[in-house]
A protein has these predicted regions:
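Short aromatic/hydrophobic "clamp" motif used to bind/position activated sugar donors
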Residues: 106
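Conserved donor-nucleotide/metal-binding helix-loop-beta segment in metal-dependent transferases, i.e.
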Residues: 118-142
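Glycine-rich, basic loop-to-helix element that forms the pyrophosphate-binding segment
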Residues: 87-101
Length: 274
């Protein structure tokens, strides 16, 4: 990508034109899905960054929006809009968006987080090169186990039950992440409405799930009344989604007694970690 950027800079300098794009060479087609609700302050910036990437489609799902977000999207050329006036489920927009593009790689972002295109590119690249699920790697941003919240712990628990403890607390719950068309066809678009369940299905089907790059969405996450404080609405939703994923895993023949869970020594070590 550095060589491509140097070429573009040289061309722009010689031609006197501004080419503010990310020179990402993809073998397959790619698209992005943005889920948003009342994000008029950031949605335009999110779209601007996505338009710097080689995407065939950009799908915006406005879910229960009451601000000026709809007008902003309607003014954007080349954007597919899904407008749901009533508030649907928290992650239903992902399932809707995935049905509206035939791209080989789908990048999922939220309308309240402005992530530079350069930081989004690694997720597209990973799937283009063979990964089925490319997660945001937040491992180094989390505190020691003893100081982690209940959401981080249940994410790690699900991964460990699925024999993917190497993924830590990394989850499709967090954005950005990218998925392959193969993954979506196998787990079905509807499963994306419950991200942990979709991730569990991908792992159970032997798909390639990785966490290739890090975007710090912890500090940049927009604070709302629904995501602040212990046991907040969003935390309860995420925990419920993980319990649904565990239930689905058990229905498919999973056995908690045979899962690779923490030993007493490991639990003590993590509890006492500082």
């Amino acid at each position: 990508m550095q060589a491509g950027k140097a070429f573009i800079q040289g061309y722009a300098h010689a031609s006197g034109r501004s080419l503010n794009i990310v020179p990402l060479a993809l073998h397959q087609s790619a698209a992005a899905v943005i889920c948003a609700c009342n994000e008029e302050l950031t949605l335009g910036q999110v779209l601007a960054q996505l338009k710097r990437l080689p995407l065939k489609d950009i799908v915006v799902v406005l879910n229960g929006t009451t601000d000026n977000s709809l007008t902003q999207v309607l003014e954007q050329p080349g954007v597919t809009l899904v407008y749901e006036p009533d508030r649907a489920g928290h992650d239903v927009g992902r399932a809707l968006g995935a049905k509206l593009t035939e791209a080989d790689t789908l990048l999922f972002v939220d309308g309240d987080m402005v992530v530079p295109a350069e930081q989004l590119a690694p997720f597209l690249y990973a799937v283009d090169r063979g990964d089925d699920v490319a997660l945001n790697n937040l491992s180094s941003l989390l505190p020691p186990f003893a100081r982690q919240d209940e959401v981080s712990r249940i994410k790690a628990y699900l991964n460990r039950v699925l024999n993917r403890s190497d993924l830590g607390s990394n989850s499709m719950t967090a954005v950005p992440h990218a998925l392959s068309r193969n993954m979506i066809q196998i787990v079905k678009p509807e499963a994306l409405a419950v991200p942990p369940k979709a991730q569990s299905l991908a792992i159970q089907h032997g798909l390639k799930v990785t966490a290739p790059s890090q975007v710090d969405v912890i500090r940049s996450n927009r604070l709302r009344s629904t995501n602040m404080g212990s046991g907040n609405e969003v935390a309860r939703l995420i925990i419920g989604d993980h319990l649904e994923a565990l239930a689905a895993w058990l229905e498919m023949g999973g056995n908690l007694s045979q899962a690779h869970l923490l030993s007493r020594a490991e639990v003590a070590y993590r509890r006492n970690a500082r």
